[in-house]
Amino acid sequence: GNIHAREYMTAQLCMAQIESYLKNYNGSVKGVKVKNVLNKMAVHYIPMANPDGTTISQFGISKIRDKKLRKALYKMSGASHTATWKANARGVDLNRNSNSHFKANHGGKRGSEGFSGTSAASEPETKAIAGLLKQLKNNKTLKGVVNYHAMGSIVFGSGGSGKVKKETQKMYRLARKITGYASGDSYGSSSGPSVGSMRDYVMEKIKSPCITLEIGVAGCPLPISQFSSIWRKNESLVLREAKLLL
């Protein structure tokens, strides 16, 4: 969750899911016996993939402790309205920085959103996510990935090939059934893959099924009033996706 800074309600959702699954380990969540799933499959979370960017979105550039970063940030596009910041503290959009369909310096200049970076996986956050995915893949324990963004109340499940495509479609159909979210697969289909997309990287380079859910319906940052509805639709989602992939 929270690869885009202003989408920090996804981190709140991930933490609430973790708490629910642990609290109900000997019971059930929405009819799913938690122990029966977690005794067979580990679920790895990255609740907040972009902590520095989230600090900017929540509290402003002044709360970034590194003096050089602060100085550079004040000169970037979006510095005057940091609540809607998406990038990390180096002005790189982490969902354009993965080593999949990457284009250097795509999106103009460093700023609040859209800039892909000078090279693929140039950012420490991107490296950390890729490192965990590779480790799990090498251990033959990676069965699937759920990617949380905001907003739109839609699910993305297109792309991939062979078994990855088949398993992704299974995850996608289940996610739509659980949440009632609309299909996002028509978005961007005519323009081809996105530059440096994390989901494309997971499916094409890591060779793992992956879906993306966009939570909420208001502009980001999502208002806290939306969380109860998001929670009702998503509490059991990761647990049920894990059960599906057993």
Describe each region flagged by the PLM.
Residues 154-219:
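Catalytic cores of processing enzymes, dominated by hydrolases/peptidases
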Residues 117-128, 167, 226-233:
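Soluble or luminal CAZymes and related metallo-dependent hydrolases
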Residues 222-246:
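His/Asp/Glu-rich mid-to-C-terminal helical/loop segments that flank catalytic regions of hydrolases
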Residues 8-12, 16-161, 212-219:
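Active-site/substrate-binding loop(s) of hydrolase catalytic cores
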Residues 97-98, 203-204, 237-243:
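MPN/JAMM (Mov34/JAB) isopeptidase/deubiquitinase module and associated MPN-bearing subunits/adaptors
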Residues 1-4, 146:
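Short beta-strand element of the alpha/beta-hydrolase
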Residues 9-13, 166, 225:
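Generic recognition of short, well-ordered alpha-helical segments
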